[in-house]
């Protein structure tokens, strides 16, 4: 049996405007820094060929980010829930979450997994295909921008001493403690 010790709603705590602003600033800052680092180490001339492939990957960045989260939660696939965040039919903006208690450490690893996994892929691709390094650095910065909400949740979870389990809901996270049910017979 689990008891909720704390509820976290990032939207109510920070607000959509602040989260969007933090995401935009993180994206711009990450691109400026990563591009300068890449430009310092690589001496290959940059190419603007295959620009439409970049546009496709820009549009797919959010779904790819979500898929990386869901792949790590594959042991909990029976508890996957999908909630459409946009009322417009043509906007594919979904919130996917696991509706079962997950250990806090496992959940924290899942929060940072897309940051390290996708960033590592983009850095490796910029090393192996240096002529498109600026494309990969832009995709890396978009990934960091998409991860801003994950970083905010991670910060709150790491500094929370309340419980050892986390359960996701449409409204945010619930931090839970596992307790023995006093009404069960031994």
Question: Residue locations for each model-derived region?
Answer:
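Metalloprotease/metallohydrolase-associated module, dominated by Zn2+-dependent proteases
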Residues: 1-38, 89-176
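Hydrophobic alpha-helical transmembrane segments
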Residues: 35, 179-186
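Loop-to-helix transition at the N-terminal end of transmembrane alpha-helices
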Residues: 44-59
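Alpha-helical transmembrane segments
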Residues: 57-61, 144-147
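Active-site recognition of the HExxH zinc-binding catalytic motif
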Residues: 61-74, 114
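Hydrophobic, membrane-facing alpha-helical anchors
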Residues: 62-67, 86-95
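Catalytic Zn2+-binding segment of zinc metalloproteases
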Residues: 69-82, 159-160
């Amino acid at each position: 049996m689990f008891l909720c010790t704390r509820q976290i709603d990032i939207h109510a705590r920070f607000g959509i405007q602040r989260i969007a602003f933090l995401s935009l600033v993180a994206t711009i800052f990450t691109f400026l820094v990563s591009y300068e680092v890449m430009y310092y180490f690589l001496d290959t001339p940059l190419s603007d060929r295959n620009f439409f492939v970049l546009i496709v990957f820009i549009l797919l960045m959010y779904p790819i980010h979500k898929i990386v989260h869901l792949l790590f939660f594959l042991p909990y696939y029976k508890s996957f829930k999908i909630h459409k965040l946009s009322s417009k039919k043509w906007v594919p903006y979904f919130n996917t979450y696991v509706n079962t208690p997950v250990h806090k450490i496992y959940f924290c690893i899942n929060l940072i997994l897309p940051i390290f996994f996708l960033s590592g892929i983009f850095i490796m691709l910029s090393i192996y295909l240096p002529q498109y390094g600026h494309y990969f650095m832009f995709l890396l910065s978009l990934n960091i921008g998409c991860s801003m909400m994950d970083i905010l949740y991670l910060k709150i979870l790491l500094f929370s001493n309340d419980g050892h389990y986390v359960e996701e809901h449409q409204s945010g996270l619930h931090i839970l403690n596992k307790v023995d049910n006093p009404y069960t017979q031994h």
